Amino acid sequence: MSSIIYDDAPLEERIHRSLSDTFKHRAIETAQDVITGKRNALVAEVENWEEFRDHAAEIRDHVLANLDYYVKEFATNAQKNGAQVYFAPTDTDALDCILDIFEDLGATSCVKSKSMMTEEIGLNKFLEKHGISAIETDCAEHIIQTAGNAPSHIVVPALHFDRTSIRDLYRERKGYTGSDDPEEITRFLRTILRPEFMNASVGVTGCNFGVAETGSCTLVSNEGNARMASSIPETQIIVMGCERIVPDLRSLDVMMKLLVRSAVGAKISGSFSINTGCRRENEADGPKNVHIVMVNNGRTNILGSNFKPMLRCIRCGACMNSCPVYRHITGHGYGSIYPGPMGIVLTPLLVGYKETAKLPYACSLCGSCADVCPVKIPLPDLIAQHRRNIVSLGYVPPAEKAAFSAAAATFSNRTLYGIATTVAPSIMKALTGNTNQIDKSTTFIPVLNGWTASRNLDPMNKEKFRTWFAHHKQERNAAQRTKAAREISAAASRVHNAAEKNLNTYKADETSLPTSSTRKED
């Protein structure tokens, strides 16, 4: 199983587990409401927000259209700054490359900052298997690592923990004796991590954006741990996706304005670093050795497909913060380190449809994700494309395929359609419960129970639409004829009245004229 997929249970089972966890729901709902509220408030302050989104999408598309050029420019400038750059076609190549660096150094441990790329390639487990401990220094990642859990969000990975469960976790695993106050827990965590930072010979970080014109790597964090991991150890290993490049610092400025606002609803993060190469002779801190591992892992395949817009992604998490499905099934319902709408698109591209054929159906296609995406990825369109691919490639359960084939045959045949619509109401009526609806009493029926286990279904009306429409048409035509007759009658009446009035006027005028005898007398 790929390191991207951490739970190989069927999608239905994962969703059932998630739906049964009340705390997760409340945590996700609260986080979505808070982060989305902050984001919306900040977005409203930016008059040209949509222009920023358009510009950011153009920047990402420009880089992707010229990726070979910008990768070369970035690598060349990074090497000029003293860094060693490695190109890893696959996750295995990346892992072997990183292991070689550790073995050359004789290092047996490292401190890590939060990095989706290292999670994608499964770095922690790989290093552990080779006797090297990787210590997560991001607070949320450290909680997850201590608990042995999977992340539930790409920005807030420990979203499924509350302060009490964190306190209990550290009491059990780390000897913590304090309260559940977040500040007190953080101070305790600092006592654990500070010695690790000071003694570490290797720091492993990700990279939010590589700047091609300078060969710099940027790090965004709220805790400052990424800066510690990239400045104290003698050696820094940067692991990044080969597409995470911007042309220049001006482009970086655009991305940063969008990233932090979209991710956590803030104007800027607590810590933002631009690391450019190794420590120079006149500098007090920073790594003496910098190794940059640029990972492909299927990205160039995506580049040449209809899913190319997905490579615009800047990993802000805005799509899952607005997603109604994520709100209910939580991050663990997806079973991937990439949850939510972006994960539904990206995971099958990296892993394949064999393991993820059902994942694209965990979406309502409401379009909320596309509305908030800072780089305007058409996520609903890409999810729909996955569904088309899954059907065309045959990754559909035999029962489902047979059901849709039967439905197609029925709807395309007038006789079969007539029989089905005649018989179906009686069958559905027989299945109704006390509510006169098809309800939980039918959970013994396969397939149907997937609906009725949680909601009721109204039976079909015995009167067919065609019958109703024909009757309605007759009534409508009769009403129209009656109305027309009334209008004609009313018009005739008006004409008659007008004619009678004119006649009376004529008669009155005629009686007022002088007679012939009167004229003779005159």
Q: Model regions: which residues?
A:
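Short Cys/His-rich zinc-binding micro-motifs
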Residues: 313
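Short coil/turn segments at secondary-structure boundaries
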Residues: 140, 183, 267-271, 398-402, ...
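Ferredoxin-type iron-sulfur electron-transfer modules in oxidoreductases and energy-metabolism complexes
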Residues: 282-310, 325-439, 482
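Intrinsic disorder at enzyme termini
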Residues: 7-12, 19-35, 45, 409-502, ...
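Generic, well-ordered alpha-helical scaffold segments in large soluble proteins
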Residues: 73, 77, 81, 97-101, ...
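The feature marks the mature, well-folded catalytic cores of soluble enzymes
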Residues: 1-309
